Regions:
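Conserved N-terminal structural module of periplasmic/extracytoplasmic solute-binding proteins
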Residues: 1-98, 158, 280-283, 303-304, ...
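A ligand-binding cleft/hinge motif common to bilobed small-molecule-binding domains
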Residues: 98-100, 255-270
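Periplasmic solute-binding protein
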Residues: 99-106, 122-159, 184-204, 287-295, ...
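Glycine-centered hinge/linker elements that transmit conformational signals in sensory
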Residues: 170-172, 205-236
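Hinge/lid segment of periplasmic solute-binding proteins
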Residues: 94-143, 165, 175-177, 270-279, ...
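Extracytoplasmic "Venus flytrap"/periplasmic binding protein-like
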Residues: 54, 59-121, 149-154, 161, ...
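C-terminal capping/gating helix-and-loop segments adjacent to ligand/active sites or protein-protein/ligand interfaces
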Residues: 348-404
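Extracytoplasmic/periplasmic substrate-recognition and gating elements
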Residues: 53-58, 63-65, 224-227, 264-328, ...
Length: 407
């Protein structure tokens, strides 16, 4: 009897096992998997996942695979992916590296009519040979951060608006306060090139013209007369910020995000801090930094990537990100929002100024394949001029020749 029940139970178990192994638990996912890379957005996972969830609900045939990449690995991993046969469909990059990839012919050309809702100046900055290579996401634009107490002690009556103004007021500041007017980080990366671009100087063909000599000599005069710190020849934004927080300089150029650092690390200085528009050159345009999305030419789902990219960067989603991070939207409608056009504090004032500056950025500085080498040449020339190693014209003539040889 026991054997009989044992065999019956064995048959039942076998039938159950056969049933569940014969019928798959899940049907195959037939959705298109669009791979999206972002840079350093891990702290905003809830923001990204909410957008992805909304998009997938509206597009049941699409699955978004989101991967966040550290800033330090962005260029390297992107280059490796671009060279492979299976790159991500949508990649978050800075415009400089994006432009280099566009020059190499590795990016999908985005139809310009798809970006009619975005800031035109920014869209125009994302073109190579007339072809649009990226979707703008968010931007920042430096403002002039200054110490009101030192401003008054220096007996200044007008805010400096140009580099010429800074040079003009430098001695007055030094005499009345014993402090420096600012620390120009003119040998940091492409800082000097960005300044020169504000005077229409942007290539080896005009780096040694009269206007360029004048700009270089202006910094030379400040340096030789001890009206800017001697450290200007080597130091970066980090050291300039430290000098501002220790009240050794009156003015500091930086994004609104630096205000948070000042507030946290030098609260007494923050109490006497105010902001004004960015320092300009002869042409009157503003510098800006941008994050954008590109679509590799080898991407499997280019149309789907473009559609998701446009959704991710629409007015609603850009404003939601801006309210979390204080960045500047690139969507024209978003920029008309009261978030950018009214303020009740220092942070919001800086944001409002930055947002207005985004509409005046042309001509932008164009990056080259060998930009780091060009930066090195220019920064070496800056040091030679400041140290008076030769007359400025000779130094710039050599710079023009060396730059041309790189091209």
């Amino acid at each position: 009897m026991k054997n009989k029940w044992f065999w019956i139970l064995s048959i039942i178990i076998a039938l159950i096992v056969t049933y569940f192994t014969a019928v798959p638990k899940n049907e195959t996912d037939t959705r298109k998997e669009v791979t999206v890379w972002t840079l350093q957005m891990g702290d905003f996972a809830d923001y990204m996942n909410n957008i992805i969830s909304k998009y997938e609900s509206a597009h049941p045939d699409i699955k978004i695979k989101w991967i966040d990449v550290p800033f330090s690995e962005g260029d390297k991993r992107t280059l490796a992916a671009i060279l492979s046969n299976n790159p991500p469909d949508l990649i978050n990059l800075n415009p400089d590296f994006s432009a280099i990839l566009a020059q190499k012919g590795t990016l999908y050309s985005i139809p310009e009519n798809k970006l009619s809702e975005y800031n035109k100046d920014i869209v125009d900055s994302l073109k190579y040979k007339g072809n649009l290579f990226a979707i703008p996401w968010y931007a920042t634009s430096a403002v002039t951060i200054y110490n009101k107490k030192l401003f008054e002690q220096a007996k200044l009556t007008d805010m400096p608006a140009t580099y010429e103004d800074l040079a003009k007021y430098a001695k007055q500041v030094k005499v009345n306060t014993g402090k420096y007017i600012y620390l120009p980080t003119i040998t940091e990366n492409d800082t000097m090139l960005k300044i020169l671009n504000k005077y229409g100087i942007n290539s080896y063909s005009n780096i040694n013209n009269n206007e360029s000599v004048k700009v270089f000599n202006q910094f030379k005069s400040l340096y030789q007369n001890n009206l800017i710190p001697k450290e200007s020849i080597t130091q970066t934004h980090r050291e300039a910020l430290e000098k501002y927080m220790s009240e050794n300089i009156v003015f500091f150029q930086g994004g609104a995000n630096f205000l948070s650092m000042i507030k946290d690390n030098a609260p007494n200085v923050y109490k006497v801090t105010d902001v004004a528009p960015q320092i300009k050159g002869k042409l009157g345009q503003n510098d800006f930094s941008l994050m954008n999305f590109v679509i590799p030419l080898k991407a499997k789902y280019k149309d789907e990537a473009l559609d998701f990219g446009l959704f991710l960067t629409n007015k609603e989603n850009q404003l939601a990100l801006a309210k979390r991070t204080n960045v500047i939207s690139t969507n024209k409608e978003a920029l008309t929002d009261s978030f950018y056009n009214s303020y009740d504090g220092l942070m919001s004032k800086a944001r409002s100024i930055s947002a207005k500056q985004i509409s005046h950025i042309q001509p932008v500085m164009r990056q080259s394949n060998n930009q780091k080498d060009i930066n090195t040449l220019v920064n070496t020339a800056v040091q030679s001029v400041l140290l008076n190693k030769d007359n400025t014209q000779n130094i710039l003539n050599k710079l023009a020749k060396d730059w041309k040889n790189l091209s």
